[in-house]
Curated annotation (Swiss-Prot):
Residues 1-18 form the signal peptide. GO terms for biological process: cell wall organization; polysaccharide catabolic process. GO terms for molecular function: cellulase activity; xyloglucan-specific endo-beta-1,4-glucanase activity. The lineage of its organism: Eukaryota, Fungi, Dikarya, Ascomycota, Pezizomycotina. It holds the Pfam family Glyco_hydro_12. It comes from Aspergillus fumigatus (strain CBS 144.89 / FGSC A1163 / CEA10). The gene is xgeA. This is Probable xyloglucan-specific endo-beta-1,4-glucanase A. Disulfide bonds: none annotated. Its main location: secreted. Catalyzes endohydrolysis of 1,4-beta-D-glucosidic linkages in xyloglucan with retention of the beta-configuration of the glycosyl residues. Specific for xyloglucan and does not hydrolyze other cell wall components.
Length: 238
């Protein structure tokens, strides 16, 4: 049977958009400007568990995906960070005009302890080691808490119209700033550049640092039959 060119192209497009699931520790798939990772970097801390991540679709710059997991043991230890990482050329903060993003997500499952967060990294050079980690937690579920030297926030800023508790602590050689939303935010639309602007103005962060990574996903600590669904995610660096 012969197919017209338009039908053939439509079938090819449908094939390209077919759901892709991966369950291996370092599994990933590249779609558009994103690399979607399973990233089970802390699975050795669990006494049992597993996780699979699925790419569902990409429309323009908007990616739809989910991850399903069950983890037990290793209380207080992160087991993974399934995330969508943006591919872009590192830029000095002084040259970054905007980091526009939208994110709609949902969680279901039993006894979930997890965070839902943007994870962004800064370096003194485009290809150098990470010096700063900037996290923006839209959800801190089941008592999940950020890295902190004191266990108490150093400030309570309002950024992008959301009230946060800001924490500071070390992660190896990096300094980690964690903005933790005071109320779970399942739908976000804003400019992530605002968080860096706040740190430059209030915490002495240098604008000479390079923005080298922008990721968004979930860090599970423990729970069962968890389903983290991202129905709308996009981000761009300009």
């Amino acid at each position: 049977m012969k197919l017209s060119l338009s039908v053939a192209l439509s079938l090819a497009a449908a094939t390209a958009q077919a759901a892709t699931q991966f369950c291996d520790q370092w599994g990933s798939v590249t779609e558009g400007n994103y690399i979607l990772y399973n990233n089970l970097w802390g699975q050795a801390q669990a006494t049992s568990g597993s996780q699979c991540t699925t790419f569902e679709s990409l429309s323009g710059n908007t990616i739809v995906w989910n991850t399903k997991w069950s983890w037990s043991g290793g209380q207080g230890q992160v087991k993974s960070f399934a995330n969508a990482a943006l591919q872009f050329t590192p830029k000095k903060l002084s040259s970054v005009k905007s980091i526009d993003s939208t994110w709609k997500w949902n969680y279901s499952g039993s006894n979930i302890v997890a965070d839902v967060a943007y994870d962004m990294f800064l370096s003194t050079s485009p290809g150098g080691d990470h010096n700063y980690e900037i996290m923006v937690w839209l959800g801190a579920l089941g008592g999940a808490g950020p890295i902190s030297s004191t266990g108490s926030p150093i400030a309570t800023p309002t950024v992008a119209g959301i009230k946060f508790n800001l924490y500071l602590g070390p992660n190896g050689s990096m300094q980690v700033y964690s903005f933790v939303a005071q109320s779970t935010t399942n739908s976000f639309s804003g400019d992530m550049r605002d968080f860096f602007t706040y740190l430059e103005s209030n915490q002495g962060l240098s604008s000479d640092l390079y923005l080298v990574d922008v990721q968004a996903g979930t860090e599970p600590f423990s729970g069962s039959n968890a389903v983290f669904t991202v129905s709308d995610y996009s981000v761009s660096v300009a």
